[in-house]
Amino acid sequence: MAKLEPDDVVLVAILPELRDLEIARVLGWYRIPLKSAPKMIRVDWIAFYLTAAFGDEKWSIRYLAPVMGYELVSRGELLADDPDHPYADEPYYKVAVGPLVQLTHPIPARRWRRITFLYTTGDKLLAARDVKELTLKRSSANAVR
């Protein structure tokens, strides 16, 4: 199993539905619409920020996975069981992920926060006790690959 290193680049990404967690766990990928994608997809890890759909686990980071690669495909290719979706032809990043790792200490957002994507580092992720502690200072953010 991959080990999170202190200087690894981590993309914190929203996980809107239970189905998305199962896709990551079972099929080994996560989807990001190209039109709302962060500037940098080439990261070492992806950490998942859980939404209200996760009940008692909402608004927290509990899982992460190593990023194995990515490709650009249509939403319809990713979710063939939903061919009539309004965004079926839209381009999405299919981010291949390795096995999910459950954090020893979940990272809650003590106050609700609207998060789509943010970058952090392995050391910040392992030390954080609140999601707000993950944000990189401007000089650190510029140094990220």
Residue ranges of model-derived segments:
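Structured alpha/beta reader/binder surfaces that contact nucleic acids or chromatin modification marks
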Residues: A2-R145
